[in-house]
């Protein structure tokens, strides 16, 4: 990880940092971080907060260059922010949080006449900064466009969805073309078996000699924005459907069984036989998928549901998020971690910079289960990122 370049480390039990070292804080852009270092007994000297806050662009570029150019990160984002002595032995500072990202830092004390810092006990403090645009009012309506008939029919229903019911975020299930080679879930196949991440399914468009299917999808995005809302797309980046563009032209970008057959992913003891799993050990695939996310951002998409995101390596997400946030810093990444370990979800939120995650309270409406689950869920959410509680999803019966 990104660490301060300190080679002669001296820890001091008589120093107290607030917030405490090793804390994990969730903040929003526009907030400030108040830091205090107390030296007891007071001594002459100066104090600073060593951090990469304020240099998110440098940190993102190092992450990107590690994947794209093979360069080792050198922690160039770290710098010392002076703390002011507000009382004998008490040093304080208010640090503005102007960038979205995950940052670290730790206060240190330089005794008078010394250039060697002394540190309070413990590892770095971590601060996750999210977009102020999504601090509140984040009710999500998940749209299955096929059930509406077309993208334009969804547009016609937006007054009901956004005005009457009050949803600010409209999220579509994957809008991509699906395979005919091996399809499940009826004639049209599963929407999570995408064949082309850079197109939309023409079956969800109306015939129009002037506007392409992608253009009609753009109309939907624009209509949501016109009502002051945000538009999310479900992007199943862990896999494709059979005979996808990637499988046809880049079969080496996929996982294979020992006998050479393509590997299908699965969860809960169920094999998803209509899918083939991508292999993110391939740097070219990582770069391609980051460009897929950027393509949809340029189309106006504000956020992504990351289907089966826990199956994709944390380092890959760190790269994709860094690449996207170079151009679109407020993009929201919603992790679908159902089926994965809670520790993996925590890491993806805390280190890979994904914003939100599915709550593990899934298809449950029993009060006692809510009461038993919520205290720990709230504690996790306050540290790592919002846990989204869905009343229903496409994975369970509709209410």
Segments from the language model and where they lie:
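Non-catalytic, glycine-rich low-complexity segments
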Residues: 7-40, 126-137
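Glycine- and acidic
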Residues: 144, 275, 301-305, 396-397
């Amino acid at each position: 990880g990104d660490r301060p370049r300190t080679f002669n480390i001296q820890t001091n039990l008589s120093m107290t940092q607030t917030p405490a070292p090793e804390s994990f804080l969730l903040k929003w852009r526009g907030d400030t971080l108040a830091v205090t270092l107390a030296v007891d007994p007071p001594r002459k000297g100066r104090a600073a907060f060593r951090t990469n806050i304020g240099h998110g662009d440098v940190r993102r570029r190092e992450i990107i260059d590690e994947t794209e150019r093979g360069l080792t990160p050198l922690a160039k984002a770290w710098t010392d922010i002076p703390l002011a002595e507000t009382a004998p032995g008490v040093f304080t500072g208010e640090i503005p949080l102007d960038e979205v990202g995950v940052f670290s830092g730790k206060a240190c004390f330089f005794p008078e006449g010394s250039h060697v810092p002394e540190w309070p006990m413990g590892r770095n403090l971590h601060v996750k900064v999210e977009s102020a645009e999504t601090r509140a009012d984040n009710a999500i309506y998940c749209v299955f466009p096929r059930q509406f008939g077309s993208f334009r029919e969804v547009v016609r229903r937006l007054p009901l969805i956004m005005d009457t019911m009050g949803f600010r975020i409209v999220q579509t299930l994957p809008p991509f073309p699906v395979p005919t080679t091996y399809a499940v879930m009826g004639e049209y196949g599963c929407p999570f078996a995408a064949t082309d991440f850079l197109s939309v399914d023409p079956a969800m468009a109306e015939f129009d000699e002037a506007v392409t299917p992608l253009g009609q999808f753009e109309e939907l995005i624009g209509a949501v924005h016109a009502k002051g809302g945000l538009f999310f797309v479900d992007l199943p980046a862990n896999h494709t459907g059979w005979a996808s563009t990637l499988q046809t032209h880049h079969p080496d970008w996929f996982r294979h069984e020992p006998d050479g057959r393509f590997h299908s992913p699965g969860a809960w003891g169920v094999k998803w036989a209509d899918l083939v799993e991508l292999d993110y050990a391939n740097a070219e695939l990582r770069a391609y998928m980051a460009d897929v996310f950027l393509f949809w951002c340029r189309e106006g998409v504000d956020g992504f549901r990351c289907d089966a995101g826990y199956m994709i390596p944390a380092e890959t997400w760190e790269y994709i998020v860094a690449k996207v946030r170079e151009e679109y810093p407020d993009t929201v990444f919603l992790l679908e971690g159902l089926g994965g370990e809670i520790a993996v979800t925590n890491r993806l939120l805390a280190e890979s910079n994904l914003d939100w995650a599915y709550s593990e309270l899934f298809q449950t409406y029993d009060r006692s289960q809510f009461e038993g689950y919520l205290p720990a869920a709230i504690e996790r959410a306050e540290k790592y990122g919002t846990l989204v509680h869905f009343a229903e999803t496409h994975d369970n019966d509709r209410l």
